[in-house]
Amino acid sequence: MIYAVVMAGGRGTRLETPVEKPLFKLHNKPLIKYVLDNINSSKLIEKTIIATSPNAPETEEYVKKLNYEILDTPGVDYLNDLSLILKSFEKKSTEDTLLFINADLPFIKGECIDYILKQYFKSGKEALSTLIPVTVFNDLGLKYEYEYQGLVPVGVNVLKSIDKIQDETQLVIEKEELAFNINTLQDASVADKYTFKYNECI
C-alpha cells in the first residue's frame, strides 16, 4: 500500500507567530490544507496519515475534524519521530511505501507527488530523497538551511515501512514549487505572491 505521511508535529518557532505552523494561513487557507488537498489529487497515494505531536494540539484537532487518521509522535526531533513512525508501520507490514511530506510545503501538487513516486519505483531502491538546485532558491529570493554540492533537500522523502538505514537514491527536480518551505514570515511573504500561480482553486 502507498501511504502519504504528513509531518505536522514540529515546533515551528522560526515562523514567529502564535499560530501553529501547519495552521498558518496563506490566503485564508492553512498550510496543511494545501498539502492535504494536493495529496488528495494524487493518483497513486492510497491513504493519508497525519503525524502530530504535543507541539501542535490545535493542528491535531483540525485534521481530526477532517477525518484523517492520526499518528502521535513525541515531536522531539525529525529523525526520532521518523523512526517511531517506521516502527509503527513495520508492525503491520514491511512492504508498504511511505511518502513523507512536511506540512509546510503548500505548492507540491498531486502530479508532482506521483512523479516522485514513479521515479522511486523505477529506481528499485528502498528509499528516495528529493532535492532541488540552490539556484531555484536564489532566483525566488528564498532562504535555505542546508545545501550540499549546490543542492538543497526538500521535505519530501520516500521509504519502505522498515525501521532501518535504507539504500537510497536521490532525485533532483528543478521545479520552483518545491522550494516553498514556509519556515519564516519572509518565506510566507514570498509564497503569498505565488499562491495563485500554483493553486488555481483556493
Residue ranges and their predicted role:
Residues 21-35:
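Short catalytic helix/loop segments, enriched in acidic residues and glycine
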Residues 103-105:
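Short acidic donor-binding/metal-coordinating loop in glycosyltransferase active sites
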Residues 24, 69-71, 180:
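Structural signal for short hydrophobic segments within the conserved structured cores
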Residues 99-101:
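Short aromatic-hydrophobic micro-motifs that form the base-stacking/packing surface
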Residues 191-202:
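C-terminal catalytic/acceptor-binding lobe
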Residues 31-97, 110-111, 151:
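Conserved N-terminal catalytic core of the sugar/cofactor nucleotidyltransferase
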Residues 1-17, 23:
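N-terminal nucleotide-binding beta1-loop-alpha1 segment
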Residues 108-193:
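Conserved core of the sugar-phosphate nucleotidyltransferase
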